[in-house]
Regions:
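N-terminal active-site segment of His-dependent metallophosphoesterases
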Residues: 1-69, 147
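His/Asp/Glu-rich metal-coordinating catalytic cores
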Residues: 50, 60-204
Length: 204
């Protein structure tokens, strides 16, 4: 049985849209608020098994309406959802990631690197949430464990700079990870590369 994944990141919901006038900001906010629903529709249409959201879903502290829009969309997407908070929406005490009651199909990674096993999909998903506005290199000395057919990680990290304060990730770390798929967010530029047996995708 194959595994179908939808991977996205960096929605920055409730961005202030600085530099735009009021009417432009209203239009941009309306368009931005449609992202969760459109993503859920795509997930259902494609019959995805997993929805991976690799950080910065919110730009900062979101409005109540925005949180409810996201929760509703995720509850209706028809997939298991894994979210890793990023540097803009990091998981600190009092964070909505900790305080909100998320739908049953949603798992938010709220601390250091951890794994969730899904036996019915023969899959193990790793992830970690930012605790502050920066993150150490989480894949340093990391090696995926378990006998599952699919070993996946979702992280908010930077594969372009070894000295990045935002979870720097090197090709060697990816190669040594033992993962089949690494889902990244952060750099706002889509792309992919193979390192060993791992496919690494950076999503926007």
């Amino acid at each position: 049985m194959g595994l179908k994944i939808l991977h996205s990141a960096d929605w920055h919901l409730d961005s202030p849209f600085a530099g735009f006038d009021d009417s432009q900001r209203a239009l941009l906010r309306q368009e931005q608020l449609s992202i969760p629903g459109k993503t859920a529709q795509l997930c259902r249409r494609e019959k995805c098994d997993l929805l991976l959201l690799a950080g910065d879903i919110f730009d900062g502290e979101p409005a109540r309406e925005t949180v409810e829009v996201l929760k509703k969309a995720l509850s209706e997407c028809g997939a298991r959802v894994f979210i890793t908070p990023g540097n803009h929406d990091f998981c600190a005490p009092g964070s909505l990631w900790l305080e909100e009651r998320w739908p049953e199909n949603v798992h938010v990674f709220t601390r250091g690197l951890e794994a969730v096993t899904i036996p019915e999909l023969n899959c193990r998903v790793y992830g970690a949430g930012y605790q502050s506005m920066d993150s150490p290199p989480l894949l340093e000395s990391f090696r995926a464990e378990g006998s599952e057919k699919y070993r996946i990680a979702v992280l908010h990290g930077d594969p372009t700079r070894k000295d990045s304060p935002y979870c720097p990730i090197t090709a060697q770390q990816v190669r040594d990870s033992g993962l089949q798929y690494l889902a990244l967010g952060h750099i706002h530029k889509a792309g992919a590369f193979h390192a060993g047996g791992t496919l690494c995708w950076v999503s926007v």
